[in-house]
Swiss-Prot record:
It comes from Bos taurus. This is NAD-dependent protein deacetylase sirtuin-7. Residues 8-28 have a biased composition (Basic and acidic residues). Interacts with UBTF and the RNA polymerase I complex. Interacts with components of the B-WICH complex, such as MYBBP1A, SMARCA5/SNF2H and BAZ1B/WSTF. Interacts with ELK4, leading to stabilization at target promoters for H3K18Ac deacetylation. Interacts with histone H2A and/or histone H2B. Interacts with DNMT1. Interacts with SIRT1. NAD-dependent protein-lysine deacetylase and deacylase activities are activated by nucleic acids. Histone deacetylase activity is activated by DNA. Protein-lysine deacylase activity is activated by RNA. H3K18Ac histone deacetylase activity is inhibited by methylation at Arg-388. H3K18Ac histone deacetylase activity is inhibited by deubiquitination by USP7. The gene is SIRT7. Residues 82-329 form the Deacetylase sirtuin-type domain.
Length: 400
């Protein structure tokens, strides 16, 4: 035994005492918790004394309860009543008209109307998985740009929106006709694969989801570059990764747009990820010089307290009202005019079997090149960029 130290038996005895005290504390915590769940009128005199003797535990448990309730409220969807929403839209329309440089940030909420589930909403993928429910999604190739996507494109055409920064990988901004120079797809695009061996990187736009075989830190798609023969990779930025590609992420343009913006409109984003990108919020500027923030979302966001206006409504509903207020017609999406068909690089001979995803086609009846008859209806989510997002949560659960 070292001088001044404890013997092995003394250390064991001290450890037993420590564990006993911890167990006694846990039991007392359980007792206090059970008592607090009772109405004050139903508590016995002995229970009242126990609460009085356990002020610290009572304070701790009440704090936990308040935090749980706060988190629950944040997850709830709230809708403004029609009159309130209309009033807010008029205020938003005034901001859009008067903005010198308006940037739009978009999230999964603008694509739910296209049957692409979000992650965090009440019917979102992670929410359902946490409840132990199965998750399915319609074939993503069946998704089409929503009213919100088409409205944003029209606003850009009218020079009311200067740039769009999107978290979505679904390619619907591209397919709505928004110029690629006017958008930054921070987390990639499911229709684009690139050759990083070429300088500058060579892009291949496809008419199918290129992410079928890719995953976190494993981005090769199995196809090769037509010029140098190098392996092609997808452009998706998975949870836990840092995007390094120039396009379609276009971080340089996103950062420049944010620095110029005097107004930012956030549509359908929880902002839980975007808030971590400081360059998008100009927080180094004094408050008076930061862009005014307008948020459209049904749930709480961490930027609500910074917003000049928060609109609780579905994106399509708000954008319909906004476009009416601005006197602008919303263009209809047409598959025949979808830009992806003119941008796409066809597969070479021998590459037709390199994927099993359903290809986009100008007519719904027309089979896409290289198709293997993927189902059109809802099906369990398997692989690809969306499926990988789902497994982020399912892997946390142990299968017994």
């Amino acid at each position: 035994m070292a001088a001044g130290g404890l013997s092995r038996s003394e250390r064991k005895a001290a450890e037993r005492v420590r564990r006993l005290r911890e167990e006694q504390q846990r039991e007392r915590l359980r007792q206090v918790s059970r008592i607090l769940r009772k109405a004050a009128t139903e508590r016995s005199a002995e229970e009242g004394r126990l609460l009085a003797e356990s002020e610290d535990l009572v304070t701790e448990l009440q704090g936990r309860s308040r935090r749980r309730e706060g988190l629950k409220r944040r997850q709830e969807e709230v809708c403004d009543d029609p009159e309130e929403l209309q009033r807010k839209v008029r205020e938003l329309a005034s901001a859009v008209r008067n903005a010198k440089y308006l940037v739009v940030y978009t999230g999964a909420g603008i694509s739910t109307a296209a049957s692409i589930p979000d992650y965090r909403g009440p019917n979102g993928v992670w929410t359902l998985l946490q409840k132990g429910r199965s998750v399915s999604a319609a074939d993503l190739s069946e998704a089409e740009p929503t009213l919100t996507h088409m409205s944003i494109t029209r606003l850009h055409e009218q020079k009311l929106v200067q740039h769009v920064v999107s978290q979505n990988c679904d390619g619907l901004h591209l397919r709505s006709g928004l110029p690629r120079s006017a958008m930054s797809e921070l987390h990639g695009n499911m229709y684009i694969e690139v050759c990083t061996a070429c300088t500058p990187n060579r892009e291949y736009v496809r008419v199918f989801d290129v992410t079928e075989r890719t995953a976190l830190h494993r981005h090769q798609t199995g196809r090769t570059c037509h010029k140098c023969g190098g392996q092609l990779r997808d452009t998706i930025v998975h949870f836990g990764e840092r995007g390094t590609l120039g396009q379609p992420l276009n971080w340089e343009a996103a950062t420049e747009a944010a620095s110029k913006a005097d107004t930012i409109l956030c549509l359908g984003s929880s902002l839980k990820v975007l808030k971590k990108y400081p360059h998008l919020w100009c927080m180094t500027k004094p408050p008076s010089r930061r862009p005014k923030l307008y948020i459209v979302n049904l749930q709480w966001t961490p930027k609500d307290d910074w917003a000049a206006l928060k609109l609780h409504g579905k994106c399509d509903d708000v954008m319909q009202l906004l476009m009416d207020e601005l006197g602008l017609e919303i263009p209809r999406y047409s598959r025949w005019q979808d830009p992806i068909f003119s941008l796409a690089t066809p597969l070479r001979a021998g590459e037709e079997g390199s994927h099993s995803r359903k290809s986009l086609c100008r007519s719904r009846e027309e089979p896409g090149p290289g198709d293997r008859g993927a189902p059109l209806s809802s099906a369990p989510i398997l692989g690809g960029w969306f499926g990988r997002g789902c497994t982020k949560r399912t892997k946390r659960k142990k299968v017994t």
